[in-house]
A protein has these predicted regions:
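Short pre-active-site segment immediately N-terminal to redox-active cysteine/selenocysteine motifs
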Residues: 88-90, 94-98, 160
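Structural microenvironment flanking redox-active thiols in thiol-disulfide oxidoreductases
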Residues: 103-138, 148-154
């Protein structure tokens, strides 16, 4: 009798695990499908260049590499900003001052920006002066371009924030995410975008 009970318990446990596995698989498929749909308009292939107006902060002025005081918006381009980080994968992070999820991501972006080049794009968050004020209040030290009308964001296919675009050292968009992204997932994408071109360069050319 005890053997029969043990057998039934084992069968029930196996069935339970199969059910859990099926549920997790369906959940993962749903997450991937939703993420794919949300990022369907984000750029692929070569990263589109864009004119940028950097918020007047010390970090932005330094990133632009142009003369100007910390109180003056600094014009530059995405290509010029990327050129300051040769051989490195970079991240472009679209956010908004009014976005609560973006605020949750700020500590991750702050940590990420200490190890990787990160460019923020403040979508529909006011002019350069207002964005700079928000940055100072929140301690956002990474360079940020202002996009008061959302024109730049729309040209990149960004319809909701936060969104993260990872560009490899050769200027190719490798990853694009929409919605909250954990820091480890951001770092993994940047590492992958940095490493894969290096590996490909070592392969024998046919």
């Amino acid at each position: 009798m005890l053997k029969a009970l043990a057998t039934r318990a084992a069968q029930s446990l196996r069935k339970s695990w199969r059910q859990h596995l099926a549920t997790l698989t369906l959940a993962w498929v749903a997450i991937v499908a939703v993420d794919t749909w949300r990022t369907r308009d984000l750029p692929q292939g070569p990263a589109p260049d864009a004119a940028l107006v950097m918020a007047p902060s010390a970090g932005a002025a330094g990133a632009a590499g142009a003369a100007g005081s910390a109180a003056t918006p600094v014009p530059t381009t995405l290509a010029a900003w990327r050129a300051q980080h040769p051989g490195q994968a970079v991240a472009v992070h679209f956010w908004a001052e009014w976005c609560s999820i973006c605020k949750l991501e700020e500590p991750s972006i702050a940590s990420l920006s200490t190890d990787w080049p990160v460019l923020g794009v403040a979508m529909q968050s006011g002019n350069a002066e207002k964005v700079a004020q928000v940055q100072r209040q929140r301690g956002m030290a990474w360079p940020t371009a202002v996009d008061p009308q959302g024109t730049l964001s729309r040209s990149w296919g960004v319809r909701a924030v936060p969104a993260l675009v990872v560009i490899d050292p050769h200027g190719q968009v490798r990853f694009a995410t929409s919605g909250y992204t954990p820091e480890w997932a951001m770092r993994l994408r940047l590492w992958w975008a940095q490493t894969i071109p290096q590996w490909k360069a070592l392969l024998p050319k046919q």
